[in-house]
Regions:
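Q-loop/switch helix immediately C-terminal to the Walker
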Residues: 26, 33-47
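Conserved ABC ATPase "signature" region
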Residues: 55-72, 181-182
């Protein structure tokens, strides 16, 4: 998104920055408390100065209807709305510049359970109507299962498994992914003892292991795992950062 510059390496994006937008985790803190909702929704266009105030107001009304906000509420301030309504406003703002990609950073974790499903279903509908690509960041496997076509599992900032959602979520291959999914509550499925984590502290980003980042906590760790791993493609097409899982 360009908000932080990388300390090393590079990232490449195509064309204008407007093709990417973001929906943040906490809708209240991501909305300007002093602006009316219609101004918030069209803020990307106001910054770009590509349209008149009348055009922006009309667009705000159109997007408000799409996300389930009544147009007559557009002159209100953010504090007058519920958490779910604020997130709908944030989604409308992300749509206003007609992006190709929207980054969703834990879009439902700050919301009540009763509202989460509504927001997820809204996102699915908008994706179909606008042809959007989502980059969804979440720790909630149920949300990932509901929303994702492809899944990347990360551990200490590294992708350890990448593949189709069906592959990764039903037949995880990397030891960390297996532990992650096995930790989900299940009535008739106890956690296998041999897959229990070793009693070690989670390393911080200043004291990362020299080899595989998961080496000190992995139940399958053996000689060879102390060597730094890179992503490799398995026969089924998924990418793994574990030589034992290939």
């Amino acid at each position: 998104m360009g908000m932080l510059q990388p300390s090393h390496g590079q990232y490449i994006r195509s064309g204008s920055q407007r093709i990417m937008q973001m929906v943040f985790q906490d809708p209240l803190s991501s909305l300007n408390p002093r602006l009316p909702v219609w101004r918030i929704i069209t803020e990307p266009l106001w910054i770009a100065k590509h349209s008149s105030e009348q055009q922006r107001r009309a667009l705000a009304e159109e997007l408000a209807v799409q996300v389930g906000i009544r147009p007559e509420y557009l002159d209100r301030l953010p504090h007058a709305f519920s958490g779910g309504q604020r997130q709908r406003i944030a989604i409308a703002r992300a749509l206003s510049s007609q992006p190709d990609v929207i980054v969703l950073d834990e879009p439902t974790s700050a919301l009540d359970i009763s509202v989460q499903a509504q927001i997820l279903n809204l996102l699915v509908t908008l994706q179909e109507n606008h042809g959007l690509t989502y980059v969804l960041i979440s720790h909630n496997v149920s949300v990932i299962r509901h929303m994702s076509d492809r899944v990347a599992v990360m551990y200490l900032g590294q992708i350890v498994e990448l593949g189709d959602a069906q592959q990764v979520l039903t037949a995880p291959a990397h030891p960390y992914t297996r532990l992650l999914l096995d930790s989900l509550p299940a009535i008739d499925k106890p956690l296998e003892e041999e897959w229990a984590l070793r009693k070690t502290d989670l390393p911080g980003n200043r004291t990362l292991p020299q080899g595989c980042f998961f080496y000190e906590r992995c139940p399958l760790a053996t000689h060879g795992c102390e060597v730094r791993q890179s992503l490799a493609i398995r026969e089924d097409g998924r990418e793994l950062r574990c030589w034992r899982a290939l």
